[in-house]
Structures are given as structure tokens and as C-alpha cells.
Amino acid sequence: MNTVSFRLALAQAASGLIGGMYTPFFGAWLGWKGLSPSHIGALLAAGMLLRVAVAPMGGVIADARDDRRGAMLVFYTIAFCGYAALNWADITALIFAAAIAANVASGAVTPLLESVSVRLSEVFRFDYGHVRVWASISFMLGNVLAGIAVSRFGLGVLAPWLSVVLILNVASIYALPAPPANRARGDFALRLRATFAEARELLRSKVFLVFLACASLDQGSHAFYYSLGGLHWRALGYSGSLIGILWPLGLLAEIALMSMSLHVLRVIGAARLLMLGACACVLRWTVMAFDPPLPVIALVQFLHGGTFAMAHLGAMYFILKSVPPRLAATAQSLYAVCSSGIAMGLATLASGPLYAAYGGRAYLLMSAMGLCSLVLALMLMRRWHGGRLTAHGEEEAVATI
């Protein structure tokens, strides 16, 4: 592992650690602070909706400035201030403001970090998966550490922990190589207008729109599993400790696939990875909809390597090969917004009423999303021939931080 890939691995690990601590316990922490379920839902939904505007704008500005590292430092600093404020916020309005700011800012870093990681993996010839895998490993570690801390000290420990981990995130981004001071020349307003114009050209590409819809439906199909999967398992009589064993099985499959991602990509290709990820979605969620026996659930958990990891790798390498480096952060932000924001948000909103009405059969909606993703993946395989999608797509790959 060279110096650049090592620094990126540290940044990915810090990012995964904060996610692993936040995801399972932040909703419970909000309840501990006295927020009602409706307030919690509104707060989390507001964060998702704001990401739709903030993440693409952050990506466009980072591309126009040709400085993704600086944008990540700004966003992580805002997130740190938000989580730090939660240690003292007792009024609902202040909790809303601080939590949403932290959620939106930390979420805006992810596509920027991915764009840098994927692009530099090509420039410095290392395996992107060997860097990205540390986010998955540290996410699992964050689950464990936060669980131990909450069990021992109560939910009140979460906000201080998140604040401390955000310091690690800021430090890990600061440790990345700084871009040359004179790299982005010319008037910023002119560069910003030029980036917007190229982004519009990208969004007029039918191939890119098919990709966005395909990848977003795949990732959005995880909404019921992420939001209500644990609750449904509890309703089936599974203990918290058993659920704690089942959940990481999917992460183990994800880690295994990420560790050999370059070989997988060379053999299968980006578009076929998206297709296989969609097939895994159809199979996984259809089986889960019928409440199979525990051994079957355990086996199906390993399909997370297909439903998430294959689709994610396919998306990352599609963007790498189809989008010019100067638009990398913009494309990554659009992908993140459509998948983690719009598709995941709408599917999460639908999951609650569907679960109340149909129980575990609500997984069939996720299966239908996977089927739509499969159709779009097949269209992508026919329409995309492996090249750049914009008129000015041919440019030298440069070490863009």
C-alpha cells in the first residue's frame, strides 16, 4: 500500500467509524433527548431532503475550484460543530438545527471522498476496493464500540463520542495531499458557470440517466431492511444478540468482495456488476418477504455482497470510466443524492405504512425496485460502450484531490 492509498484508507476508515456509531443509535439518542417518533422521523427526513440540494452543490463547487479536499474539510468542520452542539442542546429547535447540520454536512463528504478515492486509484494504480474496504470494516467496528459504550454508559455517551470521532475525520482529510495552490486558475464565477454547463450536458445524457435510475433503485431497495428490518426480526422473536450476529454477516460479504474488487471488475465489468447487484436484490428481498427459517436468513444475509457491494463497485467504476475527472465530484454527488437521498428517502417513507399493513411482505416492494433496476441495468449494458459521456470527455487523468 503506497502513501496515497494509505491516507485514503485512513479517511475511509474514519468515515465508516462515524457511520457505524451513528446508524444504529442516533434515532434512539433522539428519543432519549425527549423527541417523539414523529419529531424523529421529521428530523431524519429533513436531513435527507436537504442533502438533495447541498450535496450536488458541494460537488459542483468542489469541481469548479478543483479542490475536493478543501470542500471535505469545510463539511466535516460543520459536522463537528453540529455534533458538539448536541452535547448542550436541550431545546427541540436547537436539537433539530444541530442534528440536521451535522447529518447533511457529514453526508456531503461521502461522494467527495469516493470521487477522490476512485480517481486516485486509477492515477496511482492501486485497487479502490482495498481502500474502500476499510470503511466497511470500521463501520462494523463502530457498531461494536458504540454498542459497548451505550450498554455501559447509556445513550448519553453518543454525542460526545460522535464529536471525538469527527475530530479524527477532520484530521484524516487534512492528512490527504493538498492540491497545488495555483491549480484552479481564472475567475471562480466563470469556472463555476462552466462546471454547471458541463453538468447539464451530463444530465442530458440518456446513458447517465439510465445509470442513475438503475443504481438508485438498487441502493434504495435496502430502505426497508435498514429502517425496519431489525424491528421485524424482533417481531419474529429474534433476540437482540441474535440480530447483532445476523447484521454483520452482510458486512462480511461486503468486505470479502471489496478486497478483490479490481479482479472482479476486470472479469465482470461495471455494467454487469450493476446487473448482478440487481439480480441479488430480487432474490434477497423476495426470500426475506416470506419470513424464511433462521438458517435461510443467515445465508441470504451474505447476498449483501451482491445487493450493495457489487452495485456500489459497478457505480464507482461506471463514473470513473464515463465521466471526465473534472466532473467526478459532481457525478458522485448526483449519484449519492439519487440513491441515498431520493430513492432511499421515498422507499423509507413507504416502508412504514407498508409494514403496518403487510408486515414482512413489504420486502416485496424492495424486490420490485430490484427488478426495475435489473431492467435498467440491461438497458445500460446495451447503450454504454465504455467511453466518456460528454463531448469534452477525453482528458488526461490527473491526481485530483
Predicted regions located by residue number:
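Helix-loop boundary and gating motifs at the non-cytosolic
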Residues: M1-M48, V207-L246
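Juxtamembrane intracellular "pre-TM" segments in multi-pass secondary transporters
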Residues: M1-N2, L176-L212, E396-A397
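Helix-loop junctions at membrane interfaces in 12-TM secondary transporters
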Residues: N2-S5, L86-A99, A289-V300
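Intracellular juxtamembrane helix-capping segments at the cytosolic ends
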Residues: F26, G107-E122, M310-P324
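Helix-to-loop junctions at the C-terminal end of transmembrane segments
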Residues: A53-D67, V150-S151, A256-A270, Y355
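Structural signature of the two symmetry-related core transmembrane helices
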Residues: G70-A84, S163, R272-V287
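Cytoplasmic helix-loop-helix junction between adjacent transmembrane helices
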Residues: A99-A135
